[in-house]
Amino acid sequence: MDILALGWVSVLALFTWSIAMVVWGRNGF
């Protein structure tokens, strides 16, 4: 349960971070 939760949180964080990088890149950073 803990490992599954940790894995889900890490995947969600990586997904949101990648989106933020794309948005900032389009805005010219």
Curated annotation (Swiss-Prot):
Q: Which UniProt keywords apply?
A: Electron transport, Membrane, Photosynthesis, Thylakoid, Transmembrane, Transmembrane helix, Transport
One Gene Ontology biological process:
cytochrome complex assembly
Chief location bin: membrane
Q: Which residues cross the membrane?
A: 3-23
The places in or outside the cell where this protein is found are: Cellular thylakoid membrane
Q: Would you tell me the Gene Ontology cellular component terms?
A: cytochrome b6f complex; plasma membrane-derived thylakoid membrane
Query: Is Electron transport tagged as a keyword?
Result: yes
**Topological relation to the membrane, as annotated:** Single-pass membrane protein
Keyword Repressor recorded: no
Q: Offer an example of a GO molecular function term for this protein.
A: electron transporter, transferring electrons within cytochrome b6/f complex of photosystem II activity
SUPFAM superfamilies named in the record: PetN subunit of the cytochrome b6f complex (SSF103451)
Q: Cite the record's note on assembly.
A: The 4 large subunits of the cytochrome b6-f complex are cytochrome b6, subunit IV (17 kDa polypeptide, PetD), cytochrome f and the Rieske protein, while the 4 small subunits are PetG, PetL, PetM and PetN. The complex functions as a dimer.
What role does it play? Answer: Component of the cytochrome b6-f complex, which mediates electron transfer between photosystem II (PSII) and photosystem I (PSI), cyclic electron flow around PSI, and state transitions.
Q: Which family does it belong to?
A: Belongs to the PetN family.
- What is the protein named? Cytochrome b6-f complex subunit 8
